[in-house]
C-alpha cells in the first residue's frame, strides 16, 4: 500500500533544508545522509547525495528519472559475492 496523497511524500527535514540551502547558494557539494526512507523530490535533481548503507556512504547522483523513489533504493545494503561454485566435475 502506498502513502496517502493528502500526506505528501516523506522527506527528512534536515535533508530538505540542506538541499534548499545549496540551491540558494548554487552550490553542488555532496550531502551526507542516513535517511534512506526519504523520497526523492524534484528539488534534489542535480545534487549528489551520499546515502548510508550500514557500513559506508554510497554517492548517488540524482536525476529526473529518480523522482518519486526512495534514496535507499540506490544504495544496496547487501554484498552479493556470487553463487556457490559446484565441484561436480572434480568429484568424478
Swiss-Prot record:
InterPro entries from the UniProt entry: Ribosomal_uS19, Ribosomal_uS19_bac-type, Ribosomal_uS19_CS, Ribosomal_uS19_SF
* GO terms for biological process, alphabetical: ribosomal small subunit assembly; translation
Membrane spanning residue stretches: none
Q: Which UniProt keywords apply?
A: Chloroplast, Plastid, Ribonucleoprotein, Ribosomal protein, RNA-binding, rRNA-binding
Q: What are the record's GO terms for cellular component?
A: chloroplast; mitochondrial small ribosomal subunit
Please name the PROSITE patterns in this protein's record.
RIBOSOMAL_S19
Domain of life assignment: Eukaryota
Tell whether Ribosomal protein is among the UniProt keywords. yes
Task: Please provide an example of a Pfam family that matches this protein in its UniProt record.
Answer: Ribosomal_S19
Gene3D superfamilies in the cross-refs: 30s Ribosomal Protein S19, Chain A
Q: Which GO terms describe its molecular function?
A: rRNA binding; structural constituent of ribosome
**Where located?**
Plastid, Chloroplast
Give the UniProt family note. Answer: Belongs to the universal ribosomal protein uS19 family.
Q: What does this protein do?
A: Protein S19 forms a complex with S13 that binds strongly to the 16S ribosomal RNA.
Stated name of the protein: Small ribosomal subunit protein uS19c
Amino acid at each position: 500500500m502506498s502513502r496517502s496523497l493528502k500526506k505528501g511524500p516523506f522527506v527528512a527535514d534536515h535533508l530538505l533544508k540542506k538541499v534548499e540551502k545549496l540551491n540558494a547558494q548554487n552550490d553542488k557539494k555532496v550531502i551526507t545522509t542516513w535517511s534512506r526512507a526519504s523520497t526523492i523530490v524534484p528539488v534534489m535533481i542535480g545534487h549528489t547525495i551520499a546515502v548510508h548503507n550500514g557500513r559506508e556512504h554510497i554517492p548517488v547522483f540524482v536525476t529526473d528519472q529518480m523522482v518519486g523513489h526512495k534514496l535507499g533504493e540506490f544504495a544496496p545494503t547487501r554484498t552479493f559475492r556470487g553463487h556457490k561454485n559446484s565441484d561436480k566435475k572434480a568429484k568424478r
